[in-house]
């Protein structure tokens, strides 16, 4: 796809993408919806109020969605509308645009609505009512299971029959670039001791989890599950996600009800939501086909290619140091698809709402340096060497982690942008 707007060939926001987000700037009096294209954000509030959507009848009754401070109202319009809006914007920016008067030849509107990304502030794209994190990364689940239970019992008996998940904390989901303080809590420093007595301490095993996550668009009613064949139409779009994890706090607290404080202190997502339609060209078979016979019928999809071939990477930079890419993985390293996660979540009659966030689970490969967490790479014993010669078993204060994901070819990349966060020292407590 070629555009009249100059777009860097390595941009994750090519004309093939058109992700949606929420921005503010010194030019704007409030937060507004926008799309990212190349090095620019298109202010959809200004674009809509200036006749930008005049050639798209389907959105005319709903132009007020572009005056909201979140994308929830737009997401609730449903996938057919999202698709038409995205395709329309692609036509507006294409070299052979059928609507040159809208923006290409409209210098005044370009000046008003096209803002350099370097001059805008990104915000959470959605008001998130609930957040659920799945555990669909089979390789990660196996690797961690081996560490704790050995290879013979690495996976629980239910793992290949249902997408395991836990309910996370929506209030501490933050957008890329938000720093997080090192968490503090109860830690068992001597697991062999009897009796087992915890101490209160800053986390000493602070970790990351490389994930994708998706937002719910249209809700389902309480008591009415979403059929697997219709589940994808309830998905608005996808973001990169870092599920920060305090492994030592987790080890002491997680039996019998799972993680709590170990994961509730911060979850970072990318600010630009990549619509599910933009990922369609990258469909592939995941770790197992989506239509495999071993699944119960409510989870069995009609097609095999229910995953996405999206290269992912993890970069770590220590304070004042050089960046080091410590891992390369791929989004296809998942056992369950997004529709399967959504169908399973609702099978009991649970109602999902517009803006709910559902994480994939940690996406790890099978080889060394394809793991999506420090726990898998180091096991707390085998340090990762950074570019400046320093070593890491887990994250230290001042470390910055950036997750990236981008599919496609030069000039037509579909990516998420950076999912970045820096670790600050723990807050001083008066205990």
From Swiss-Prot:
Catalytic activity, as annotated: 4-fumarylacetoacetate + H2O = acetoacetate + fumarate + H(+)
Binding site for substrate: 135, 149, 250, 254, 362
Pathway terms, separated by semicolons: Amino-acid degradation; L-phenylalanine degradation; acetoacetate and fumarate from L-phenylalanine: step 6/6
Entry cofactors: Ca(2+); Mg(2+)
Record's note on what induces expression: By phenylacetate (PhoAc), 2OH-PhoAc, 3OH-PhoAc, 4OH-PhoAc, phenylalanine, and tyrosine. Not induced by acetate or glutamate. Expression is partially repressed by glucose.
EC number assigned by the record: 3.7.1.2
One Pfam family named in its UniProt record: FAA_hydrolase
Miscellaneous field: Disruption of the fahA gene results in phenylalanine toxicity, secretion of succinylacetone and the absence of growth. This is analogous to the genetic disease, type I hereditary tyrosinemia in humans.
UniProt record similarity statement: Belongs to the FAH family.
The protein, known as: Fumarylacetoacetase
């Amino acid at each position: 796809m070629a555009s009249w707007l100059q777009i860097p060939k390595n941009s994750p926001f090519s004309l093939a993408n058109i992700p949606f987000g929420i921005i503010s700037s010194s030019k704007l009096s409030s937060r507004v919806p926008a799309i990212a294209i190349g090095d620019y954000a298109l202010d959809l509030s200004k674009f809509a109020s200036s006749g930008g959507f005049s050639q798209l009848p389907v959105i005319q009754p709903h132009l007020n969605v572009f005056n909201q401070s979140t994308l929830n109202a737009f997401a609730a319009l449903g996938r057919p509308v999202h698709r038409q809006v995205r395709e329309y914007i692609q036509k507006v920016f294409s070299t052979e645009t059928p609507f040159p008067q809208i923006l290409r030849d409209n210098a005044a509107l370009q000046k008003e609505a096209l803002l350099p990304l370097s001059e805008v502030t990104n915000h959470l794209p959605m008001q998130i009512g609930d957040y659920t994190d799945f555990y669909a990364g089979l390789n990660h689940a196996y690797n961690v299971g081996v560490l704790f239970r050995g290879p013979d019992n690495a996976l629980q008996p239910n793992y290949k029959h249902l997408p395991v998940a836990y309910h996370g904390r929506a209030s501490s989901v933050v957008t890329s670039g938000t720093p997080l303080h090192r968490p503090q809590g109860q830690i068992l420093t001597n697991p062999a001791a009897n009796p087992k007595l915890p101490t209160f301490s800053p986390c000493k095993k602070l970790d990351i989890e490389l994930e994708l996550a998706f937002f719910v668009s249209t809700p389902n009613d309480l008591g009415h599950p979403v059929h697997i064949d219709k589940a994808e139409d309830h998905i608005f779009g996808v973001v990169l996600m870092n599920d920060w994890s305090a492994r030592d706090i987790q080890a002491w607290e997680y039996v019998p009800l799972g993680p709590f404080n170990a994961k509730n202190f911060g979850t970072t997502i990318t600010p630009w939501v990549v619509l599910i339609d933009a990922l369609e060209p990258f469909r592939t078979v995941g770790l197992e086909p989506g239509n495999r016979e071993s699944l119960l019928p409510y989870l069995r999809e009609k097609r095999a290619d229910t995953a996405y071939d999206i290269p992912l990477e993890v970069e770590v930079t220590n304070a004042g140091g050089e960046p080091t890419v410590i891992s390369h993985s791929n989004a296809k390293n998942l056992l369950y698809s997004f529709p399967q996660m959504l169908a399973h979540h609702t099978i009991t009659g649970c109602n999902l709402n517009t803006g709910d966030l559902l994480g994939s689970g940690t996406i790890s490969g099978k080889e060394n340096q394809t793991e999506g967490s420090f726990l898998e790479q180091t096991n707390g014993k085998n340090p990762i060497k950074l570019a400046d010669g320093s070593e890491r078993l887990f994250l230290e204060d001042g470390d910055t982690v950036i997750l990236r994901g981008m599919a496609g070819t030069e000039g037509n990349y579909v990516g998420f942008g950076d999912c970045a966060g820096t670790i600050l020292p723990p807050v001083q407590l008066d205990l």
